[in-house]
């Protein structure tokens, strides 16, 4: 090592000055997500959030969640469209804790990137901030990690973390689900943030590096309108941000709606998520007739499923099939909950019903 020359951090590929500019570019976005409980601003060693209001609860339970966006980011990078993947990140975390009836309080993000550019970073964090505002939670901190020599300059990955609270007497519990209960669904915007490893195979983007002529040609191809998608492009349909269901569902619960359980339909589709909201002695029977579900499926999910030649069972354990969130309610409460959801601007539909069983999801065309 004696013949080694002087090397700076910048020589190694880490641009701390550009990192500082990136922080300056996002400060106002972060501030705009603040709740009254937030103490101070970004730049400290930890995000501060007052818990004083929790004393008004009988037994406050803190619920945490963490997730990422997965390989949907590959498509965003090829298309050079980064403004909404942050909303995907927030949605994946806050919708998960919403399944327990929790209100998201605050959020933190982690961005690993090959090379930090302030303008690029601002686009990503704007999506995170927009998602936090949709969820009503504060963005109290985060990390931008530059990984030169490990990741390509334009390559990045995202992770998110949220903490929420629910009063124990109001916490949703799958143990409350009974045979005869009705399963209601709320529509997704499309694929949301799961199933993109399959999507990438179908649309032929595997192995394409962002910023290359090959990526530009593929981006042009994916931007063309398709008749099968009602004139939308594959890029638009596949990059539609994941819905955040927090505000309407919390309002529904605060208004006294009797909801037994909620399932966020993510990786594993209906088959491997709805079962997580069931009691051990209950099965969910989901309405299906062959490749047709009992509700409208977004055209992009139908398109990808057909291109991949997925059997109905494979599609249902890969994609959300147009259902972003499921609510399980007693049959006598179905009409009231449906009416309340409509009043909140939602478009609920019946997904199926619960029967005696062993905690599985089954389909009506297989019974």
Regions found by a protein language model. Give the residues of each.
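Hydrophobic alpha-helical scaffolding
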Residues: 12, 16, 80, 189-192, ...
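Glycine-rich phosphate/pyrophosphate-binding loop regions near the starts of catalytic domains
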Residues: 28-189, 285
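Glycine-/charge-enriched secondary-structure boundary and capping motifs
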Residues: 2-11, 120, 124-138, 151-158, ...
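Short, acidic (Asp/Glu-rich) active-site segment that either coordinates a divalent metal cofactor
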Residues: 66, 157, 170-230, 234, ...
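N-terminal amphipathic/basic leader segments beginning at the initiator methionine
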Residues: 2-37
């Amino acid at each position: 090592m004696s013949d080694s020359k002087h090397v700076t951090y910048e020589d190694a590929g880490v641009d701390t000055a550009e990192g500082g500019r990136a922080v300056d570019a996002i400060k106002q976005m972060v501030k705009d997500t603040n709740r009254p409980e937030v103490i101070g601003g970004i730049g400290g060693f930890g995000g501060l959030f007052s818990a004083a209001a929790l004393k008004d609860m009988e037994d406050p339970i803190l619920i945490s969640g963490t997730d990422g966006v997965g390989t949907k980011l590959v498509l965003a990078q090829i298309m050079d469209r980064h403004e909404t993947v942050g909303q995907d990140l927030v949605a994946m975390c806050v919708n998960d804790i919403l399944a327990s009836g929790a209100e998201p309080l605050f959020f933190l993000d982690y961005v690993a990137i090959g090379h930090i550019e302030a303008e690029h970073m601002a686009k990503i964090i704007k999506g995170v901030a927009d998602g936090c505002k949709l969820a009503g939670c504060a963005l109290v901190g985060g990390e931008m990690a530059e990984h030169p020599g490990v990741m390509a300059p334009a390559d990045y990955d995202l992770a998110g973390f949220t903490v929420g609270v629910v009063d124990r007497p109001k916490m949703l519990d799958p143990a409350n689900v009974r045979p005869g209960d009705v399963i209601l669904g709320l529509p997704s915007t499309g694929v949301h943030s799961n199933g993109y490893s399959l999507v990438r195979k179908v649309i032929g983007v595997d192995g394409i590096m962002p910023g290359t002529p090959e990526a530009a040609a593929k981006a042009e191809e994916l931007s063309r309108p398709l008749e099968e998608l009602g004139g939308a492009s594959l890029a638009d349909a596949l990059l539609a941000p994941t819905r955040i269901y927090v505000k309407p569902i919390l309002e529904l619960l605060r208004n006294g709606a009797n909801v037994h359980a909620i399932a966020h339909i993510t990786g594993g589709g209906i088959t491997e998520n709805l079962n997580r909201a069931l009691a051990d002695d209950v099965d969910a029977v989901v309405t299906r007739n062959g490749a047709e579900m009992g509700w409208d499926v977004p055209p992009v999910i139908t398109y990808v499923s057909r291109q991949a030649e997925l059997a109905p069972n494979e599609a249902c354990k890969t994609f959300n099939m147009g259902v972003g969130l499921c609510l399980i309610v007693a049959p006598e409460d179905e009409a009231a909950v449906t009416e309340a959801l409509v009043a909140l601007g939602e478009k609920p539909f019946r997904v199926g019903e619960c029967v005696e069983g062993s905690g599985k999801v089954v389909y009506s065309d297989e019974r």
